[in-house]
Curated annotation (Swiss-Prot):
GO molecular function ontology, one term from the record: histone H3K4me3 reader activity
Keywords: Cell cycle, Nucleus
Name of this chain's protein: Spindlin-2
Family (UniProt): Belongs to the SPIN/STSY family.
Region of interest called Tudor-like domain 1, as start-end residue ranges on this chain: 50-99
Stretches the record annotates as Tudor-like domain 2: 129-178
Biased composition range(s): Basic and acidic residues: 13-22
Predominant localisation class: nucleus
Source domain of life: Eukaryota
Any single GO CC term annotated in Swiss-Prot or TrEMBL for this entry: cytosol
Encoding gene (name): SPIN2
Function of the protein: May be involved in the regulation of cell cycle progression. Exhibits H3K4me3-binding activity.
Length: 258
């Protein structure tokens, strides 16, 4: 895993996958594949690590081993081997099969506790969730750069943090957004008069996308595959997608109107 630079610098390195590419609208039904036939390690004897602090090495190809520490935020229900992890000093959330990924070396459960945190301003927290925002970051020369995005949810375990994604970089990030709001670095965008809650698609249809495989067509015509792993409660048309060849969690609106 390469360490992305924090704040505005990270966003200047926008991933190739988000550069004017189109997410294929076609959804393929989950197939009974070889993955389903593989023997799975027994989860009954394995400790629940959600909420735990972890450390491990990371070895990819010929690159030197790097050491990582972080907090396990969640276990994905449709793929219990997949965990969402917030690593120390990293702003984005990673999705990794901690017990299966061969690049992960010497996984350890650390004795240190996750610091207890709670939201002091519940009203403000409820106000920003689901809202379009402009998030200000300090640029290279001290200038302020605004990044438009959406606040998705309060993060699990680390309750003072919030999930957020950006138009220019649609992967899952998490920040202490209430602090940013009070410091004037997070602005709620005015809602469009054209939008209406009544325009949402039927929830039953939307729920049916969870667990489905998706195909992503890049600008050069090449494709990558992944799976829809989560639906955003505050914005039911928005989903988390985990691609097979990437440990980032991507965030897309899968039922946008043409």
């Amino acid at each position: 895993m390469k360490t992305p630079h924090k704040k505005a610098t990270a966003r200047q390195q926008t991933r190739e996958i988000v550069d004017d590419h189109t997410l294929s609208a076609s959804m393929r039904k989950k197939k009974i594949s070889q993955k389903k036939q593989r023997g799975r390690p027994s989860s009954q004897t394995r400790r629940n690590i959600v909420g735990c602090r972890i450390s491990h090495g990371w070895k990819e190809g010929d690159e030197p081993i790097t050491q990582w520490k972080g907090t396990v935020l969640d276990q994905v229900p449709i793929n219990p081997s997949l965990y969402l992890v917030k690593y120390d000093g990293i702003d984005c959330v990673y999705g990794l099969e901690l017990h299966r990924d061969k690049r992960i070396l010497k996984l350890k459960i650390l004795p240190d506790k996750v610091p207890f945190s709670r939201v002091r301003d519940v009203h403000l927290a409820n106000t920003i969730i689901g809202k379009a925002v402009e998030h200000m970051f300090e640029g290279e020369h001290g200038s302020k750069d605004g990044w438009r995005g959406m606040v998705l949810a309060q993060a699990p375990i680390m309750k003072a943090w919030f999930y957020i994604t950006y138009e220019k970089d649609p992967v899952l990030y998490m920040y202490q957004l209430l602090d940013d709001y009070k410091e004037g670095d997070l602005h709620i965008m005015p809602e469009s008069s054209k939008s209406s809650p009544k325009e949402r698609e039927p929830e039953g249809v939307i729920d049916g996308l969870i667990g489905k495989h998706v195909e992503y067509t890049k600008e050069d015509g090449s494709k990558r595959t992944g799976k829809v792993i989560h639906q955003v409660k505050a914005k039911p048309s928005v989903y988390f997608i985990k691609f097979d060849d990437d440990f980032h969690i991507y965030v897309y609106d899968l039922v946008k109107k043409s």
